């Protein structure tokens, strides 16, 4: 029991920082909203899911975390060693920014490649969609929806992102912190309910308008814009769709589905698994078994 309590306490600083940053985004959302009069009830449900994510994810990461350590020990400290110090030789004032700001952008760009395919699989593989659908059930998209995420998603990302990145790159703690910070802030930004069109930068860096299309249930937007930071991956792999001028569509699940209770949504992947386990066999195999009886 003490381990459980210690784990929850360890998440409190991250939760505090998260909600303070979300609060600042909320102020901006009130000033320049993309969607006016969002439901306070919906925003409250986002907050509940945020808390459940921060509380449950550390427990879900215990086994995957051990696998990351094992892979790192097996393959060493990364196959790719990036060193940009030569670019700033003799320019002391540029050395720190290059090492700690520019250098992490390289693995961040590659991480987005892995995220693109992870995200695409979440939409194409039914078993992965059962947990990811919670994120898309947000009918009022705002910064809080960034962590309206099922606790199962984080351990799954270990296999599609963390381990591949750990094998490829050797990054120090400072660079790793910058990467994590950048990803978190980008997540808040792209989900924010703010009317900030990027204009010519739209296909270069992901923004709220472009990501809003990904959350749209409209057929023309479905299964589009998977990248989290750099739309180039969607452009290269044929899943990019640009927003029309002034286009800020409604968001939510396709086919008019709506989210259920918090408890139901968190248990939903296991509900689906249980139903499949109880579903009678069908098809040729079932026919043969029926004939044998």
Which residues fall in each region the model found?
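Short, strongly hydrophobic alpha-helical membrane anchors
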Residues: 1-12
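Membrane-interface helix termini and inter-helical loops of multi-pass transporters
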Residues: 3-5, 75-92
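Loop-to-helix transition at the N-terminal end of transmembrane alpha-helices
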Residues: 13, 17, 41-55
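Structural signature of hydrophobic alpha-helical transmembrane segments
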Residues: 15-26
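Membrane-interface helix-loop junction between the first two transmembrane segments
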Residues: 27-48
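Membrane-embedded catalytic scaffold of the fatty acid hydroxylase/desaturase
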Residues: 55-71, 78-80, 92-250
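A membrane-cytosol interface segment of integral membrane proteins
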Residues: 248-293
